Amino acid sequence: MEDGPLPDLRDIELKLGRKVPESLARSLRGEEPAPREGAADPSGVGGSCSSSSSCSSFAPSVSSSSSSSPASGSPRRSHPSALERLETKLHILRQEMVNLRATDVRLMRQLLLINESIESIKWMIEEKATVTSRGSSLSGSLCSLLESQSTSLRGSYNSLHDGSDGLDGISVGSYLDTLADDVPGHQTPSDLDQFSDSSIIEDSQALHKHPKLDSEYYCFG
């Protein structure tokens, strides 16, 4: 039997719903099996005579019967051989029981190891599921952030290139005017409009002026 600490069998008893046999528990603890009461005496003599008087009274009868019937000696000779065969069978049976108990002990230890391995694997699976859920939530947040950024950039680009929207055109024009104001010496379209209006007004005023006439008249006769 393998030497080692006594395993705790309460977990297995709770899972199986049955109590571990006492003989198996004794085998696990390394104790010897309890002796059975009323075991047969291998010599075959003990228990046959209760007192010396009965044995002495039994001996003459046996001798007289043996002297009277000489042919009855063969069953008496076969009786010790039958006891020997029975003792041999009992010894073999006890040895097989010891081997079975040792096998049960090994199986019980293997079951305990398997139970611990299953518990550790279950714990690892639960931890992996927790890490996977956290990773999926983080990846989902990152994907949503990237999608929102790409959508906003695409919308801004489309609004800049969409000429059908008057508001966008005004906003783009005002933005360009603002940029032109920042550049020194650059004339904006509004400055050109003011320049053309002022030149037209000056030309019209020059046309409306009357020519200056001399006050002296010359008469030719």
From Swiss-Prot:
A Pfam match: LURAP
Gene Ontology process terms (BP): positive regulation of canonical NF-kappaB signal transduction; regulation of signal transduction
Protein origin, superkingdom: Eukaryota
Species assigned in the record: Rattus norvegicus
Region (Disordered): 1-81
Biased composition (Low complexity): 48-75
InterPro entries: LURA1/LRA25, LURAP1
Keyword Transferase attributed: no
Keyword tags: Acetylation
Keyword Acetylation: yes
Chain intervals with Basic and acidic residues compositional bias: 8-21, 28-39
Annotated protein name in UniProt: Leucine rich adaptor protein 1-like
Modified sites of kind N-acetylmethionine: M1
